[in-house]
Amino acid sequence: MPYRRITKDSYWSSSQNSTYNTWVESKTRVAGEHLADADPQYEYAFNSGYNSPPNTRVFGRGTAIFIHCSEPPGNSLGVFTHGCIAIPRDRIVQLLDILDPARHPWCAIGTLEAGTSTSIKAY
């Protein structure tokens, strides 16, 4: 899967303009999440595609739901996110190795209830 490295100037924008819900490189502060502040969680991460193209981004509907490393690495017990999904580092690496944007992968987010995995597999 193609990737880019977070720099000290990397932000995920929540500004109400053309940069809403996109990655922005800026020397000045941008409204939204300063991605470098989430180290080591964002050592490996990807965007689930929530409220992103090909659908039109809708301001106020929320920005990215990232799938990122749990912290401390490899331990998902007692870990909280800001609305993202945290999984062990080795699982993120496995996912990044097999995800292919040309195959249009998608992310199903929900609660684990009886029959849920069967329903998801039906897709």
Where are these regions (language model features)?
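Cell wall/extracellular polymer interaction/catalysis modules
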Residues: 1-81, 91-123
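Short, conserved phosphate/pyrophosphate- and ester-handling motifs at nucleotide-, phospho-/glycolipid
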Residues: 88
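Short cysteine clusters
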Residues: 84
